[in-house]
Regions:
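Active-site segments of SGNH/GDSL-like serine hydrolases
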Residues: 123-126, 144-174, 196-199
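Conserved beta-strand segments of alpha/beta enzyme cores
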Residues: 88-90, 154, 186-188
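Active-site flanking residues adjacent to catalytic metal/cofactor-binding acidic residues
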Residues: 70-72, 158, 190
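N-terminal secretory targeting modules
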Residues: 1-66
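Catalytic His-Asp segment of secreted/periplasmic serine-dependent ester chemistry enzymes
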Residues: 164-230
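Conserved SGNH/GDSL esterase-like catalytic core that processes O-acyl groups on lipids
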Residues: 37-140, 164-173
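Alpha-helical scaffolding segments of alpha/beta enzyme cores, especially the outer helices
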Residues: 137, 141-145, 174-181
């Protein structure tokens, strides 16, 4: 009888231990995820390239007749001014930028009250495993800030482009559908995804690395938005 009681007691202790161990593991993993997200959101603060580009943009003027291309590396790596032969175009793309990074530097753009802003941002958020709700929240903050600080500016939200990862493109397509819902009279959504996607991927003819566009890719992008730029 004593032996059975001892076994029951040990069994209860082990169950209690495993329960608390499981709770601690769940809490620890959740805490790590929160810290990782927080670090991702603030990566631009420690990114020397981002800070250098931002400091340069702070010294450059944007005027009321300008057209601003705002985004990450996909925006940054094109020669928009030459593509459109338009000296009023200003490239404000930064490689690796996210919705948080755009929010952080938006003042350098809205203070000049540009005529138009072409915005493409979000792929790096998705690559960093940010959830759609967070990205959309930042998008709304970006659009609201533009509307408040520069009410006459027309914003063109360009859909995120596909890449060569089919699973990633499912997330991209879902986010694009949500972005389209944010459109209004002064926020115009431009669907570029469907123009670039083929068999659920970005075709090799438009890219060398599966993500960034080559010359042909940028020519197609230009063709798709030409009527909005001019």
């Amino acid at each position: 009888m004593k032996k059975r009681n001892i076994i029951c007691f040990i069994s209860i202790l082990l169950n209690i231990f495993f329960i608390f161990s499981g709770i601690f593991t769940i809490y620890k993993n959740h805490r790590v995820q929160i810290l990782q997200k927080d670090n991702i959101n603030k990566n631009f603060i420690k990114n020397a390239y981002y800070l250098a580009k931002q400091s340069q943009f702070e010294t450059l003027n944007i005027n009321s007749g300008d057209i601003v291309f705002l985004g990450d590396s996909l925006t940054n790596r094109s020669q928009w001014q030459e593509l459109f032969n338009n000296s009023h175009i200003k490239n404000r793309g930064i490689d690796g930028d996210t919705t948080s990074g755009i929010l952080n530097r938006l003042n350098t753009i809205t203070r000049g009250h540009p005529k138009k802003i072409f915005l493409m941002i979000g792929i790096n958020d998705l690559l960093h495993k940010q959830d759609t709700a967070y990205i959309l929240s930042n998008y709304e903050k970006i659009l609201n800030k533009i509307r408040t600080d520069s009410p006459d500016t027309i914003v063109y939200t360009e859909s995120i482009l596909p890449n060569n990862n089919i699973k990633s493109n499912r997330d991209v397509k879902f986010l694009n559908n949500e972005l389209q819902k944010l459109s209004s009279s002064k926020i115009i959504y431009i669907d570029l995804f469907d123009r670039f996607v083929k068999y659920d991927k970005l075709p090799g003819e438009y890219t060398y690395d599966g993500t960034h566009l080559n010359g042909l890719g940028y020519s197609i992008w230009k063709h798709e938005i030409n009527k909005y730029v001019n």
